[in-house]
Amino acid sequence: MQYFSKKKLVLPEGYFVNSSQIPLAKEVNKLLANCGCETFPIKALNEAIKKSNFFFTIQNELKNKLYGFVRVTSDRALNANVWNLSALPGNNQKLYYSILLQVTLEKINREMPGCSISVQAPVSSFVSLEENGFILDPNGIRVMGYKL
């Protein structure tokens, strides 16, 4: 199913979405921790970001700080996986999540049409995920196997 955004969301003045400058893994870990998410060894996280198909950050022109982050991996045929969705807690957290989801889904739709999308995300993002068309599964992904 293709994604079409209902309305264009706007960041507060001075904030922007960046997809060209790789964020410092230390800063991503700080953001993940603030969201109550698991953090990762710096070297492993840095490699994961570099090997991702793409990523987006939300930053401020005046402050050297991350306000949001998401990265995507995909086989470009069947699956697109959204990882490390995180947004700084506060008044704009829901807006940051929604903007990250909007730009991510637009890019997946454009570059990876037909891929099913799986998301690894914190509880604080659930409202934004639902508002962007995701169906939350309270039981999560279940492993399937076939015994030979």
Predicted features along the sequence, with ranges:
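Conserved GNAT acetyl-CoA-binding A-motif
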Residues: I108-A121
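A short, internal acetyl-CoA/4′-phosphopantetheine-binding micro-motif in the GNAT/acyltransferase core
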Residues: N84-L95
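A conserved beta-strand-loop-helix scaffold within acyl/acetyltransferase catalytic domains
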Residues: E38-L62, L66-S86
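Short amphipathic alpha-helix that is part of the acyltransferase structural core
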Residues: M1-K43, G140-V143
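Conserved catalytic-core motifs of GNAT/GCN5-like acyltransferases
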Residues: I135-L148
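Conserved active-site tyrosine of GNAT-family acetyltransferases
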Residues: V127-E131
